[in-house]
Amino acid sequence: MASQGTKRSYEQMETGGERQNATEIRASVGRMVGGIGRFYIQMCTELKLSDYEGRLIQNSITIERMVLSAFDERRNKYLEEHPSAGKDPKKTGGPIYRRRDGKWMRELILYDKEEIRRIWRQANNGEDATAGLTHLMIWHSNLNDATYQRTRALVRTGMDPRMCSLMQGSTLPRRSGAAGAAVKGVGTMVMELIRMIKRGINDRNFWRGENERRTRIAYERMCNILKGKFQTAAQRAMMDQVRESRNPGNAEIEDLIFLARSALILRGSVAHKSCLPACVYGLAVASGYDFEREGYSLVGIDPFRLLQNSQVFSLIRPNENPAHKSQLVWMACHSAAFEDLRVSSFIRGTRVVPRGQLSTRGVQIASNENMETMDSSTLELRSRYWAIRTRSGGNTNQQRASAGQISVQPTFSVQRNLPFERATIMAAFTGNTEGRTSDMRTEIIRMMESARPEDVSFQGRGVFELSDEKATNPIVPSFDMSNEGSYFFGDSAEEYDN
């Protein structure tokens, strides 16, 4: 990992805090999730949800979306200035599912945003608690990462669909702050930058005019976030070039796409956090658990332990497989959409299959779907072991590049090799090494060529028994070295549409 001395830990970003010691961090993260739990309980009371209905993940998602919408100042302002038919800018709502006479019913509810904000603040000691809101955004983003593919978005920006493993956090809203930036993949940042540059190419006044400074600052900030994700000097130097460009255009887009491709082997550092649905925190608070006193961490044993003792339900469509639905939500809870399936399977204790083999669609139910045939089942979110979440890309030998896998961005700090098809990746780098970044490009290609697929990442790191909360006895799994495990092979997922 690049020297983290100057960076705040991602729990600090998550809670908006300055430097704190471990105990203070655990307490402030605990306060954050405890606030989410209290809010959820209060909403269940307001909506008169039964215990079973309150544990339904679809109801949890509706309630989460309502509070996110209530605090979305930019959109609220926009809605007030551009009134659209049938949308009350002061109200928010969504589908709530209730059990009536042995059947599931959908009820559309509407609430004043002001009222939702009041309930949220009340649950969070009168504060806005933006950290808690960001936490919910990251949970939704992790769910999207596991559920949808972004091939169309990749192709639209001129990137290759095989770079899907770099797209973590691609559906996070812009307002998700430092905690959101930490979990965004290299591809996501590249895509945001390319969109911005394309706007500048098409709109002459984008870099000029009254917003000139704000636009420029936003551009440089995004460049710096992306630069911070790269772990080799040459990649960072190329980012400096992109950032300092007077008038960003096609040359910068080329450089960014080159960098994104290089990240398939010279992986960036991307944070992973286990963000759980609000109902899980609600259940714990309701059972008397004091998160702030006990402390909580998003990257250790705590989320695993919470999921061991939580019963969450989901609506199931007629031809869906409940075990597959559980896998989808398990991956989302641990931010493991881009993890090697060999590692995920070992930790979960049951085989985790690629998305192309899942008989399940997304968790959310569209408003035109027939409720008559809906069933519900328990989500199996427990695990056999737990492991520490990582924020490094798993490159071996300090700052040197290691074998990447076209399709993996490690989530868990667990020893494994990262098999990859060098030929497939290198084929993308033929030709263009001229221009002002030529020496950096040459250096990056040289590092990639010297990467070996048999190198071991996270040397000596293992998983832990759920009884081993202090992480004293690592169990280092041995994996079949040849068999790479990408979730995205044979992909048949739907596209993500806003």
UniProtKB/Swiss-Prot annotation:
Function: Encapsidates the negative strand viral RNA, protecting it from nucleases. The encapsidated genomic RNA is termed the ribonucleoprotein (RNP) and serves as template for transcription and replication. The RNP needs to be localized in the host nucleus to start an infectious cycle, but is too large to diffuse through the nuclear pore complex. NP comprises at least 2 nuclear localization signals that are responsible for the active RNP import into the nucleus through cellular importin alpha/beta pathway.
Species for this entry: Influenza A virus (strain A/Duck/England/1/1962 H4N6)
GO cellular component, one term: host cell
Molecular function, one GO term: structural molecule activity
Keyword field: Capsid protein, Helical capsid protein, Host nucleus, Host-virus interaction, Ribonucleoprotein, RNA-binding, Viral nucleoprotein, Viral penetration into host nucleus, Virion, Virus entry into host cell
Record localization: Virion; Host nucleus
Positions of short motif Unconventional nuclear localization signal: 1-18
Region (Disordered): 1-21
Subunit structure, as described in the record: Homomultimerizes to form the nucleocapsid. May bind host exportin-1/XPO1. Binds to viral genomic RNA. Protein-RNA contacts are mediated by a combination of electrostatic interactions between positively charged residues and the phosphate backbone and planar interactions between aromatic side chains and bases.
GO BP terms, alphabetized: symbiont entry into host cell; viral penetration into host nucleus
Reported modifications of this chain: Late in virus-infected cells, may be cleaved from a 56-kDa protein to a 53-kDa protein by a cellular caspase. This cleavage might be a marker for the onset of apoptosis in infected cells or have a specific function in virus host interaction.
RNA-binding among keywords: yes
InterPro entries recorded: Flu_NP
Matching SUPFAM superfamilies: flu NP-like (SSF161003)
One of the Pfam families matching this protein, by short name: Flu_NP
UniProt protein name: Nucleoprotein
UniProt similarity note: Belongs to the influenza viruses nucleoprotein family.
UniProt keyword Ribonucleoprotein, yes or no: yes
Bipartite nuclear localization signal, short sequence motif: residues: 198-216
Main location: virion
